[in-house]
Design a protein with these regions (language model features):
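Active-site cores of enzymes that catalyze phosphoryl transfer or operate on phosphate-rich substrates
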Residues: 16, 22-31
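Structural motif
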Residues: 33-35
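Mg2+-dependent endonuclease catalytic cores in nucleic-acid-processing enzymes, primarily RNase H-like
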Residues: 1-6, 13-15, 23, 42-176
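Short acidic-glycine loop/turn motifs at beta-strand connectors
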Residues: 28, 38-42
Length: 176
């Protein structure tokens, strides 16, 4: 069924319904995998591209490449250039490197996330993870957001099952 829903649109081009971009990254030992998603009205979404940054994630140059990637602009079908508005990165592997990278990013741009199956909400409140020498949490230190993976996976599967309306419009949450 999912195969039958596929659409033919150019990767790395934001479609006309896309209003802003987000990105998510997963860190592995030998690479960082990233997806950029365009979001439109009513949570309609398009995968703009899937990118792999190869290299040992213990090395600084891999993280510098991630920084360069996160600053990319993507062409909108209107000709405008859109930046990535928000960047989530999983901190389950290479946790300290993820926190270090997030700290270096502009305020409210990058967020370290940690998935949990026991979450009762899709996205929890941030938890400060940086401490000073006395064990007090730093006000402007790195934070990690808990992500309810079971809830989000269930929601994603529901969105993937949606079909185009008879009038050619798309229902809320439709994934292209």
């Amino acid at each position: 069924v999912l195969f039958d829903k596929r659409e033919d649109y150019r990767q790395e081009l934001v479609p006309s319904g896309g209003l802003f971009l987000t990105a998510g990254a997963d860190v592995q030992k030998d690479r960082i995998e990233c997806e950029v998603v365009a979001w439109g009205r009513n949570r309609e979404s398009w995968s703009v591209g899937y990118f792999i940054i190869n290299g040992d994630t213990a090395r600084e140059d891999v993280w510098n490449e991630l920084t360069d990637f996160s600053r990319r602009y993507f062409e909108h079908s209107s000709g405008a250039m859109l930046p990535i508005s928000r960047f989530a990165i999983d901190s389950g592997f290479a946790t300290q490197q993820v926190y270090n990278w997030v700290r270096k990013q502009p305020l409210n741009f990058a967020m370290a996330i940690k998935g949990t199956d026991s979450g009762v909400t899709p996205l929890g409140l941030p938890t400060k993870v940086d401490l000073n020498i006395n064990g007090k949490k730093l006000r402007r230190g790195a934070k990690v957001w808990t992500v309810g993976t079971s809830i989000l996976k269930s929601e994603l599967y529901q969105f993937l099952r949606l079909t185009q309306n008879e009038d050619e419009s798309f229902p809320a949450g439709y994934c292209h």
